[in-house]
Amino acid sequence: MECHNQQSSQPPTTTHCSGGETNCYEKRWHDHRGTIIERGCGCPTVKPGVKLNCCTTDKCNN
C-alpha cells in the first residue's frame, strides 16, 4: 500500500506502508492556525471533532 503522508498544504509526498497495512487515512481538524490535515498509513482512532477519512487504494488519501 502506498499512501500520501504530507501535512496540510505541503507538496505531495508518499510512503510505502509496512506490516501489510491496507488502509490510508486523512485527518482534518481546526485550531488557531486554521485547518490542519494529516495523512498517513492505517486508520487511526480520532478524538471528537476530528474528521477522519480512511480508504483502501494506493494514494487514495490526498
Swiss-Prot record:
<comment type="similarity">
    <text>Belongs to the three-finger toxin family. Short-chain subfamily. Type I alpha-neurotoxin sub-subfamily.</text>
</comment>
<keyword id="KW-0964">Secreted</keyword>
<protein>
    <recommendedName>
        <fullName>Short neurotoxin 1</fullName>
    </recommendedName>
</protein>
<dbReference type="InterPro" id="IPR003571">
    <property type="entry name" value="Snake_3FTx"/>
</dbReference>
<feature type="disulfide bond">
    <location>
        <begin position="3"/>
        <end position="24"/>
    </location>
</feature>
<feature type="disulfide bond">
    <location>
        <begin position="17"/>
        <end position="41"/>
    </location>
</feature>
<dbReference type="InterPro" id="IPR018354">
    <property type="entry name" value="Snake_toxin_con_site"/>
</dbReference>
<dbReference type="GO" id="GO:0090729">
    <property type="term" value="F:toxin activity"/>
</dbReference>
<keyword id="KW-0528">Neurotoxin</keyword>
<keyword id="KW-1015">Disulfide bond</keyword>
<keyword id="KW-0800">Toxin</keyword>
<dbReference type="InterPro" id="IPR054131">
    <property type="entry name" value="Toxin_cobra-type"/>
</dbReference>
<keyword id="KW-0008">Acetylcholine receptor inhibiting toxin</keyword>
<feature type="disulfide bond">
    <location>
        <begin position="55"/>
        <end position="60"/>
    </location>
</feature>
<dbReference type="GO" id="GO:0030550">
    <property type="term" value="F:acetylcholine receptor inhibitor activity"/>
</dbReference>
<comment type="function">
    <text>Binds to muscle nicotinic acetylcholine receptor (nAChR) and inhibit acetylcholine from binding to the receptor, thereby impairing neuromuscular transmission.</text>
</comment>
<keyword id="KW-0872">Ion channel impairing toxin</keyword>
<feature type="region of interest" description="Disordered">
    <location>
        <begin position="1"/>
        <end position="20"/>
    </location>
</feature>
<dbReference type="GO" id="GO:0005576">
    <property type="term" value="C:extracellular region"/>
</dbReference>
<dbReference type="InterPro" id="IPR045860">
    <property type="entry name" value="Snake_toxin-like_sf"/>
</dbReference>
<dbReference type="Pfam" id="PF21947">
    <property type="entry name" value="Toxin_cobra-type"/>
</dbReference>
<dbReference type="GO" id="GO:0099106">
    <property type="term" value="F:ion channel regulator activity"/>
</dbReference>
<feature type="disulfide bond">
    <location>
        <begin position="43"/>
        <end position="54"/>
    </location>
</feature>
<keyword id="KW-0629">Postsynaptic neurotoxin</keyword>
